[in-house]
Amino acid sequence: MANPKAKMSKSRRDKRRAQFNARTKAAVTVVCPNCGEPTLPHRACRHCGHYKGRQVTGKSVVA
């Protein structure tokens, strides 16, 4: 049976395991309260540019 040649740090171990978890989890989306489009949480809406109830980018609502 194979034995490790050197100790693997927790950081290196967790980086390796993160690749599996990144592939298995589905992307989470929330509905923008301003325009109703699906968007990523904790980020400005790509459609209307609003975040936390205020305009943060130069886009305007096309509705």
UniProtKB/Swiss-Prot annotation:
Region (Disordered): 1-20
Coiled-coil portions: none
Pfam families, alphabetized: Ribosomal_L32p
Keywords assigned by UniProt, alphabetized: Ribonucleoprotein, Ribosomal protein
Family label: Belongs to the bacterial ribosomal protein bL32 family.
Composition bias type Basic residues, residue spans: 7-18
Molecular function GO labels: structural constituent of ribosome
A GO cellular component annotation in the UniProt record: large ribosomal subunit
Name of the protein in question: Large ribosomal subunit protein bL32
GO BP annotation list: translation
Protein origin, superkingdom: Bacteria
NCBIfam families: rpmF_bact (TIGR01031)
Signal peptide coordinates: none
InterPro entries: Ribosomal_bL32, Ribosomal_bL32_bact, Ribosomal_zn-bd
Entry annotated with the keyword Nucleotide-binding: no
Record SUPFAM superfamilies: Zn-binding ribosomal proteins (SSF57829)
